[in-house]
Amino acid sequence: MRVIRMTNYEAGTLLTCSHEGCGCRVRIEVPCHCAGAGDAYRCTCGDELAPVK
């Protein structure tokens, strides 16, 4: 089964770094609608940011 990750998040979405031990968090206030907006948001460490569950 192929899983497609949704990287376009709505305003208010809280994201956290996927890197073990990082834990930084970012809240999306205004989603990006630019070319390449389907790419994952990333932490400065380089790992993807994922929605907080």
Curated annotation (Swiss-Prot):
Top-level taxon: Bacteria
GO molecular function ontology, one term from the record: copper ion binding
Keyword field contains Metal-binding: yes
Binding-site list for Cu(+) 3: C24, C32, C43, C45
GO biological process: response to cadmium ion; response to cobalt ion; response to copper ion; response to nickel cation; response to zinc ion
Protein residues bound to Cu(+) 2: C17, H19, C45
Sorted UniProt keywords: Copper, Metal-binding, Metal-thiolate cluster
Tagged with keyword Metal-binding: yes
Bilayer-crossing regions: none
Induction per the UniProt record: Up-regulated by copper, cadmium, cobalt, nickel and zinc, but not manganese. Copper and cadmium salts afford the strongest metal-dependent induction at about 1,000-fold. Also highly up-regulated under conditions that are believed to be attained in phagosomes of interferon-gamma-activated macrophages, including production of nitric oxide and reactive oxygen intermediates, mild acid (pH 5.5), and cell wall perturbation. Repressed by RicR.
Binding-site list for Cu(+) 4: C24, C32, H33
List of residues binding Cu(+) 1: C17, C22, C34
Effect of inactivating the gene: Cells lacking this gene show hypersensitivity to Cu(+) toxicity but not to divalent heavy metals such as Zn(2+). Deficiency of MymT does not impair M.tuberculosis virulence in mice.
Pro-peptide positions on chain: 1-6
Stated role: Metallothioneins are small proteins that have a high content of cysteine residues which allow them to bind heavy metal ions through clusters of thiolate bonds. MymT binds up to seven ions of Cu(+), with a preference for four to six Cu(+) ions, in a solvent-shielded core. MymT protects M.tuberculosis from copper toxicity.
Other comment: NO and reactive nitrogen intermediates (RNI) can displace Cu(+) from MymT.
Family note: Belongs to the metallothionein superfamily.
Annotated protein name in UniProt: Metallothionein
